[in-house]
From Swiss-Prot:
Organism encoding this protein: Staphylococcus epidermidis (strain ATCC 35984 / DSM 28319 / BCRC 17069 / CCUG 31568 / BM 3577 / RP62A)
Coiled-coil ranges (or none): none
InterPro entries reported for this sequence: Holin-like_CidA (IPR023760), LrgA/CidA (IPR005538)
Any single GO CC term annotated in Swiss-Prot or TrEMBL for this entry: plasma membrane
Similarity comment text for this entry: Belongs to the CidA/LrgA family. CidA subfamily.
Membrane topology: Multi-pass membrane protein
GO aspect biological process, one term: programmed cell death
Function: Increases the activity of extracellular murein hydrolases possibly by mediating their export via hole formation. Inhibited by the antiholin-like proteins LrgAB. In an unstressed cell, the LrgAB products probably inhibit the function of the CidAB proteins. When a cell is stressed by the addition of antibiotics or by other factors in the environment, the CidAB proteins possibly oligomerize within the bacterial cell membrane, creating lesions that disrupt the proton motive force, which in turn results in loss of cell viability.
Protein name: Holin-like protein CidA
Gene field: cidA
Major subcellular site: membrane
Length: 130
C-alpha cells in the first residue's frame, strides 16, 4: 500500500511539473517571447516556488525522481552525436576547441551570475562583507 501511495504521489507531482512547463510553452506562444517555452515554464515554476504558491512539498518526490534519472535524458543527445561522428572526426580539433570554449563560457557566466545573486541577497539582508 505504501508503494502505491508513493507511485501515485510521484505521478501527480510529475504531472504538476509537466503542467507548469506546458503553461510556460503556451505563455511563450501567446506573448511571442523570444525564449524557449520550457525556459518560460522554468521561470514561472521558480516564481511559483519563491512566492510559496506551489509549496516545495508538492513537487519534492517528482523533482527527486527527475534528478536521479537525469542521465537518461542525455542519452538521445549522445546518440545524435554518434550520427555525425564522421563529421566530428574530420574536424575533431575544431570540435574540441568549441567544446572547451563553450564549457569555459558557461562556467564563467554561471559563476558571475551566482556571485551577483549572492551579492544582491547579502545586500538585501544587510550582511555585505565584501
Amino acid at each position: 500500500m505504501e508503494k502505491a501511495k508513493f507511485v501515485i504521489k510521484l505521478i501527480l507531482q510529475l504531472a504538476l511539473i509537466m503542467l507548469i512547463t506546458f503553461i510556460g510553452t503556451e505563455v511563450q506562444k501567446l506573448l511571442h517571447i523570444p525564449l524557449a517555452g520550457s525556459i518560460v515554464g522554468l521561470m514561472l515554476f521558480f516564481l511559483l516556488l519563491q512566492f510559496k504558491i506551489v509549496p516545495e512539498s508538492w513537487i519534492n518526490v517528482g523533482a527527486d525522481f527527475l534528478l536521479k534519472t537525469m542521465v537518461f535524458f542525455f542519452i538521445p543527445s549522445v546518440v545524435g552525436i554518434m550520427d555525425v561522428a564522421s563529421n566530428i572526426t574530420m574536424n575533431y580539433i575544431l570540435f574540441f576547441i568549441v567544446i572547451i570554449i563553450g564549457t569555459c563560457l558557461v562556467a564563467l557566466s554561471s559563476g558571475y551570475i551566482a556571485e551577483k545573486m549572492l551579492e544582491k541577497s547579502n545586500t538585501r539582508k544587510g550582511t555585505d562583507h565584501s
